């Protein structure tokens, strides 16, 4: 092996090592993201989803994770203004957790935004919202 080949090989190896290190550093400082699906009317499932979201925030730090709970189908009833989960939804949104209702489900169930909790957001389709988030690299959880 001549000296020129040795130097080129060393430079390539060093460059590859730096690229791997930079990727690892970026991955360790990247914000975590999780989307939770709730499509059941069961208050216990809602409590579990809200507990999961809160636990993730406590473990990773609220500023280091984006959390979105997407409700559709029978699960959307727990996002009504007078639902038994209303106080927990308020706490979650105040903690920075995004809670989203499916507008398709609202239309089928003849619900309007006036019927819903004031702090939630909306997506045209709950399933598509989850698909988009997964496509963006979000972790998916269905309690």
Label each residue range with its predicted role.
Residues 1-13:
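N-terminal secretory signal peptides and thylakoid transit peptides that target proteins
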Residues 8, 22-143:
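Secreted/extracellular ectodomain signature
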Residues 14-21:
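Hydrophobic h-region of N-terminal signal peptides that target proteins for export
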